[in-house]
Amino acid sequence: MTYLRITLAALAALALGAGFTPATGAAQQKLKVHISVDMEGVGGVVTGEQLGPSGFEYGRFREFMTREALAAIEAATRAGATEIIVADSHGNGQNLLIDQLPAEVRVIRSWPRRLGMVAGIDDTVDAAIFIGYHAGTNNPAGVRAHTFSSANLTRVALNGTDVTEGSWNAAIAGHFGVPVIMMSGDDAAIAEVRKAVGDLEAAETKRSLGFHSALTLTPQASATLIGNRVSAAMSRRSAFRPLKVQTPVTVDVSFKHYLPSEILAYLPLFERTDSHSVRFRAKDMVEASAIMSFIGDYRPDITP
């Protein structure tokens, strides 16, 4: 018993000397963080050459995207996060170099997902972070601005207000009572999300000069800024509030071509509001997200 007391005392002294605080008897408080990672808002991204497998810079920018995600993960962990879920939410959903992420992180990859870019979020999550986000499709100022699909959609509105991916995903998080505390992306994307959720912490990785041009930070500078802003957000986490929308929700979707709206209107769920647009109603954001996922992901030739 004497030996045990001496050993415990020695260990405590070593821990204090290393800067640790001894436990008070209670288990470490759980703190769960969800990080949704897109790519258009990553520092340096300006054209499709950085955004998909056919682009000559895609391989390098997967590294930069991963570096930005890792900066957010490490900062959240230092601030006390005990569980982190990362959703790879760009393109095919298989962009992050997951072997470079900490072993404790869990990663959501590929599609389809009922909750889209924030798949994995629920009421056990304490905070949401958006990395690499971009402006919405009708914003003339954003780099690579679009909403969900640059190829197919020209507008998405929630309860009569145009939404971006950032504000839509914030509303899904809000359904579960989860606040968005930090985001990164270009100046236009940040302004849009702040308009929806309030003055969250933000890392401006670049300033838009046009759809395909920007004044950008370097990858290292972007990652450093993201880490700093995540740290700041985590330190005042209690100051943020979840985005709540009125339910049931009404969603308007406009397509680049007329045929999708014509065919969707065959279903009683959808009302065709003009040649290129449909409207649907959902009981909440979870149901609305599932319907939007159907619109975006369904094809009759899907295999297997």
What is each residue range found by the language model?
Residues 172-180, 184-229:
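Active-site rim beta-loop-alpha module in soluble metabolic enzymes
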Residues 56-87, 93-94, 104-105, 229-236:
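Alpha/propeptide regions of enzymes that mature by internal proteolysis
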Residues 7-19:
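Bacterial N-terminal signal peptides
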Residues 150-176, 185-188:
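Active-site glycine-rich loop that binds ribose-phosphate moieties when present
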Residues 28-48:
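Mature N-terminal segment immediately following signal peptide/propeptide cleavage
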Residues 103-121:
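A glycine-rich helix N-cap at a beta->alpha junction
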Residues 84, 222, 227-304:
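C-terminal accessory domains and tails appended to enzymatic cores
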Residues 44-69, 201-205:
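A short alpha/beta connector and helix-capping loop motif
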